[in-house]
A protein has these predicted regions:
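Conserved N-terminal strand/loop that marks the beginning of ABC ATPase nucleotide-binding domains
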Residues: 38-47
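Active-site-adjacent C-terminal substructures of enzyme catalytic domains
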Residues: 291, 301-418, 430-436, 442-444, ...
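Divalent metal-coordination and catalytic microenvironments
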Residues: 46, 78, 83, 114, ...
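Metal-associated gating/positioning segment near the N- to mid-region
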Residues: 101-175
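Histidine-rich, glycine-flanked metal-binding segment
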Residues: 17, 21, 28-38, 52-117
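Conserved beta-strand scaffold positions in the cores of enzyme catalytic domains, especially
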Residues: 42, 106-111, 224, 450
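Non-catalytic positions within long, well-ordered alpha-helices that form the structural scaffold/packing
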Residues: 184, 248, 256-257, 308, ...
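Metal-coordinating catalytic core of metallo-dependent amide/deamination hydrolases
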Residues: 155-176, 181, 189-305
Length: 462
């Protein structure tokens, strides 16, 4: 679908912002002084500008055929001021604009030379707070051990706990910051980051503080999630109700009081928490005004009805889902967040039923599920490639699921996930000539520039 939006820059710029325009030398000097810089950016000569502008007037996440509406502008242009997108259209219209003619030398201009520009990816499911990779699990899986067998032998999630419990917060902050930087290099600008490898009140709060501190040093956007209910720690084995009580009465209230999390997550599956326990945790989260989300259906079917009454932002994994639950989910705005990287790395033959969900009208998002055990990938393009090849999503559906629907899964769609005036200036520039190449060139990184809240990330000297 092609669009030609009228590029009326002058009308979009508030008067108080006009005197803050920076030229290139100003940007360079401010960078040297370590001040936060949001240069006024003009991206021009974009081969395909993927706006994700939507023709439907009905609010809510993309579903069905709406996932294929990319709102492509050929030879596009974008102007960003003060960390926001203010105008979108064709380069031809932009260069005619009187305001840009007058101020062009004061704006940091990026010639995209026919490359593809799209909204920064929204990775709505990650586990970045850990210390070491799970190499033993990797080898055991190669030898034929299942997820459940590895967990029963002391591997899996519990094997990451000791490292987080003993690590200093500074170590965790630097770890998370490195992850965020690597994600940005692949075009990701918004990240949901979970705790979940501490499993004590102290270690879960330390993990959330590490996320907060790392986020303060990264120009992108980070949404923190308390995942105290990841698994039952070994000291509570056989006493799951007591651990759930700890999560509900201590972890959740403290995370809410300290404003360390926006969401509470729970892993509801065999070997983790029951649906009844998940409901108890959701009740506690709701009482403390925290939104909820859940890992569900990764290993076995779980009835979704009890979860939906809490209006979860997303239900994630969804490998095993019943027909009646699909029909029910299609009547809600809860997003089904699919993480094919986990299925790939676990060597599974089956993948989440994306086609069935999409065709039924369920809103679907894609995420990396970045974690040390089952999906150690930072790359949203790789997640998209797996979605196309193993879940039969089209490239257009993959892009929408990785951007605007990811934003809906984090309840950030008013700010993130599309290239439209008024939204945050989050952009990814890919050195390809067609958007379909992004999932096509799997295992490579074609992202050459990322813009996060108006700040440049990458080698933009050329």
């Amino acid at each position: 679908m092609r669009l030609g939006l009228y590029f009326s820059i002058g009308k979009m710029i508030p008067d108080h912002a006009r005197h803050r325009l920076l030229n290139s030398s100003s940007v360079a000097s401010l960078r040297k002084s370590n001040q936060k810089v949001r240069p006024q950016l003009f991206l021009a000569n974009i081969g395909q500008l993927i706006t994700l502008r939507y023709s439907s007037l009905k609010p809510g996440p993309r579903r069905g055929s709406g996932l294929k509406e990319l709102g492509i502008i050929e030879n596009g242009a974008v102007l960003c001021l003060g960390g926001k997108i203010v105008s979108v259209g064709t380069t031809k219209d932009a260069l005619r604009d009187p305001w840009l003619k007058k101020n062009r030398k004061k704006v940091t201009e990026i010639d995209c030379a026919g490359k593809v520009v799209l909204p920064g990816f929204v990775d709505s499911h990650t586990h970045p707070v850990f210390v070491s990779p799970r190499l033993m699990d990797f080898e055991k899986r190669i030898e034929g051990a299942s997820y459940e067998e590895i967990a029963a032998a002391g591997g899996g999630i519990r094997s990451s706990v000791e490292g987080v419990r003993t690590a200093g917060k500074r170590v965790l902050v630097e770890k998370v910051l490195t992850v965020l930087g690597d994600m940005a290099a692949h075009g990701t600008t918004t990240v949901e980051a979970k705790s979940g490898y501490g499993l004590t009140v102290e270690s879960e709060m330390k993990s959330l503080e590490a996320i907060r501190d790392a986020a303060s040093r990264w120009p992108g956007t980070v949404i923190a999630t308390l995942l105290g209910a990841h698994v039952v720690p070994k000291e509570f084995q056989g006493r799951s109700p007591k651990y759930v009580e700890l999560v509900c009465k201590e972890m959740i209230p403290l995370a809410a009081k300290r404003r360390l999390a926006q969401f509470v997550d729970v892993f509801c599956d065999k070997g983790a928490f029951t649906a009844v326990e998940a409901e108890q945790i959701f009740e506690a989260a709701t009482q403390h005004r925290l939104s909820v989300r859940a890992h569900v259906g990764q290993l076995s079917e779980t009835a979704l009805g009890p979860f939906l009454r809490f209006n979860p932002a997303s239900l994630d994994h969804m490998d095993h889902v019943r027909e009646d639950d699909i029909a029910e989910l299609a009547r809600h705005d809860t997003v089904a967040t699919l993480v094919p990287g986990a299925n790939y790395f676990l060597g599974l033959k089956e993948y989440p039923p994306a086609r069935k969900l999409i065709d039924a009208g369920v809103p679907v998002a894609l995420a990396t599920d970045y974690n040390p055990g089952t999906s150690p990938t930072l790359s949203m393009p790789m997640a998209m490639s797996l979605a196309c090849t193993h879940m039969k999503m089209s490239p257009a559906e993959g892009i929408a699921a990785a951007t605007i629907n990811g934003a809906w899964a984090l309840r950030l769609a008013d700010r993130k996930g599309s290239v439209e005036p008024g939204k945050d200036a989050d952009l990814a520039v890919f050195d390809v000539s067609d958007h379909r190449e992004i999932p096509y060139w799997f295992g490579t990184n074609r992202c050459v520039l990322t813009v996060m809240n108006g700040e440049l990330w990458g080698d933009f000297s050329s």
